[in-house]
């Protein structure tokens, strides 16, 4: 995934994972 979700995941998981985003390099990306 290369589309940023506008969320970081340094301290907490991606809340945006509910819409298909996942944590990569401390930033949430959508696949």
From Swiss-Prot:
SUPFAM superfamilies cross-referenced by the UniProt entry: Cyclotides
Record-linked InterPro entries: Cyclotide, Cyclotide_bracelet_CS, Cyclotide_sf
Cross-link (Cyclopeptide (Gly-Asp)): 1-31
Keyword line: Disulfide bond, Knottin, Plant defense
Transmembrane listed as a keyword: no
Protein family: Belongs to the cyclotide family. Bracelet subfamily.
Described function: Probably participates in a plant defense mechanism.
Record text about domains: The presence of a 'disulfide through disulfide knot' structurally defines this protein as a knottin.
Name the record gives this protein: Cycloviolacin-O19
Organism: Viola odorata
Lineage: Eukaryota, Viridiplantae, Streptophyta, Embryophyta, Tracheophyta
């Amino acid at each position: 995934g290369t589309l940023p979700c506008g969320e970081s995941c340094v301290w907490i998981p991606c809340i945006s994972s509910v819409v298909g985003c996942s944590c990569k390099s401390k930033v949430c990306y959508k696949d």
